[in-house]
Amino acid sequence: MILVVNAGSSSIKFRLFNDLDKSNPIDILDGLAERITVDGAVSFKYEGKKYEYNVELPNHEVAIKFILDKLIELNIISNVDDINAVGFRVVHGGTISKSSIIDQKVFDTIKDAVKLAPLHNPGAITAIEAIEKVMPKAKLVACFDTAYHQTLAEEQYLYAVPYSWYKEHGVRKYGFHGISYQYIAEKMSEVLAKPKDQLNLIVCHLGNGASITCIKNGKSFDTTMGLTPLAGVMMGTRSGDIDPSIIEYMCKELQLDVSKITNILNKESGLLGLSGKSSDMRDVTGGYFKGDEDYKRALNKYTQVSADYIIRFANLLGHNIDGIVFTAGVGENSIHTRQFILEKLPLLDIEIDNAKNEESYGDYKYISSPNSKIKVLAVRTNEELMICKDTINLTK
């Protein structure tokens, strides 16, 4: 079996896969340990039943041990050795270009990247150390959100700042959501019956965190997020791209230091900042149709910024666009967000089929009409399955 782990500073999302068929692993259990170091709660779903526990979780090691003990107690596994490998989602892998077995060199790279992802990498490090103690025989694999974007050309990843900043301090565009983009590229190769290395896509990963990526010949060619996940399109609570001078200006205006202003740009901006009310797209679209001016302002800006990047990436692909894909929480589920973005793309001659856009679906659906010059789809991403597959390939 394969365990997939996505750990934060106080939470662990986990999913267990049966890998008897290595080419088609099946997820059998999905769970969450949360409020680690505060008080603690563990919940998971197995065979249609939900299990919930309130338990003291002083650290990640105790949380993982509790999870494994419950899996044994419920006869889901007979012992920890039934799990032969663990795949970790790691947000920042520096310049590592593919999923990797975690050896000392890879682990040191993850630690070095903490300064680039201070909100995300520490949780992964803590979880890796905990699982090494609790599951000493398991093979450990790191899957990086940055790895997929290591194919960017220099003109895409460099910033117009002193070159020494890049050479000496690693200041460059890294990009994120790479595990999701990797999954979507593979899925779209199946859907369109086209070899992945010939695939040209514009993929909109729109969740609370959001980014858009231009995929050319199956590889990341450009992407919206940058050195950190703060850059690019407008998001739930993140600003996306702004004039860098705003930071110094608002430090002086509000008498706050840089870290506090950066925190506002990360946690109090985006949809939440412009509406002053909510970061949840369901609230925003609901308010929009009730005539709420604050939500109108937020949604109009969000959809315009997204459309602007799609046009920019369409230019990079020329007349060879196999499809525009919407994925992640907002992209998969928000009918009106998709519609409003597509309506802001007159140059692309896209024709939306409103009935298709509104209907429920399984893994994917077309939302463009047969007359549309470019195919448009909503596709459900599956980062955990992608991590599982990479883990199997590296450990079999």
Curated annotation (Swiss-Prot):
Cofactor note: Mg(2+). Can also accept Mn(2+).
Cellular component GO terms, alphabetical: cytoplasm
PROSITE patterns per the UniProt record, alphabetical: ACETATE_KINASE_1, ACETATE_KINASE_2
Keywords of this entry: ATP-binding, Cytoplasm, Kinase, Magnesium, Metal-binding, Nucleotide-binding, Transferase
Assembly description: Homodimer.
Residues forming the catalytic site: D145
Binding, substrate: R89
Biological classification of the source: Bacteria, Bacillati, Mycoplasmatota, Mollicutes, Entomoplasmatales
Residues the entry annotates as binding ATP: K13, H205, L206, G207, N208, G209, D280, M281, R282, G329, V330, G331, E332, N333
HAMAP family: Acetate_kinase
Site feature Transition state stabilizer, where: H177, R238
EC numbers, comma separated: 2.7.2.1
Chief localization: cytoplasm
Protein name per its UniProtKB record: Acetate kinase
Source taxon at top rank: Bacteria
Function text: Catalyzes the formation of acetyl phosphate from acetate and ATP. Can also catalyze the reverse reaction.
